[in-house]
Regions:
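Short pre-active-site segment immediately N-terminal to redox-active cysteine/selenocysteine motifs
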Residues: 53-55, 59-63, 94, 126
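A short beta-strand-turn-helix
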Residues: 30-55
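N-proximal helix/coil linker or "cap" segments that precede and/or mark the start of modular domains
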Residues: 15-37, 167
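Hydrophobic beta-strand anchors of alpha/beta hydrolase catalytic cores
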Residues: 56-57, 87, 130
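Thiol/disulfide oxidoreductase modules built on the thioredoxin-like
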Residues: 100-106, 113-160
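Bacterial Sec-dependent N-terminal signal peptides
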Residues: 1-22
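Structural microenvironment flanking redox-active thiols in thiol-disulfide oxidoreductases
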Residues: 68-106, 115-120
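C-type cytochrome heme c attachment motif
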Residues: 62-69, 129
């Protein structure tokens, strides 16, 4: 009987340790696929020149705590990768609502999309949701920027830029 118990425990242990932790996107995966056409209804900052740049697009809202928590990281990425990367925050809220938010301060490009065109194509079901698009228009990273174990970090961005930057 003891042998059967040990055998069962061993099989259970192997099964549990073999399980892979998966990243839940809360959206349709576009990894390594063409990104949907870029669309906003109104820029709240000047419109960036996107040609030849990587785009980090953050779908967010002022009422979303995790969205606001990610803003300082996105500010950091915008400064750190200024030569290669454009960070854009897109909210579906009213212009006045977004402009009224003072803390944390957004130090990257900002726009609203009241039509939610890109959100619908990406089938986003949870925010914040970030996509990182290479200069050829392919999604190279997608997800929640602070998701434990799958965080979007400077190292991740650097690796993607080095791999997909046009020479």
């Amino acid at each position: 009987m003891y042998k059967y118990f040990l055998f069962g425990l061993m099989v259970f242990s192997i099964t549990v340790s073999a399980q892979v932790v998966e990243k839940n996107l809360y959206a349709k995966s576009f990894i390594d696929q063409k990104a949907p056409d870029f669309h906003v209804t109104k820029w709240l900052t000047n419109e960036p020149k996107r040609e030849g740049k990587f785009l980090l697009i953050d779908f967010w809202a002022t009422w979303c705590g995790p969205c606001r928590k990610a803003i300082p990281e996105l500010n950091k990425f915008s400064k750190e990768f200024n030569d290669d990367l454009i960070v854009i925050g897109i909210s579906n809220e009213k212009e006045e609502t977004v402009k009224r938010m003072q803390v944390p301060k957004i130090e990257y490009y900002s726009a609203i999309d009241s039509t939610e065109k890109m959100e619908k194509i990406l089938e986003i079901k949870g925010i914040p949701h970030v996509i990182l698009i290479d200069p050829d228009g392919y999604v190279r990273w997608q997800g929640f920027p602070l998701y434990p174990g799958f965080e979007l970090t400077s190292d991740v961005i650097k690796e993607i830029i080095e791999k997909y930057k046009k020479k």
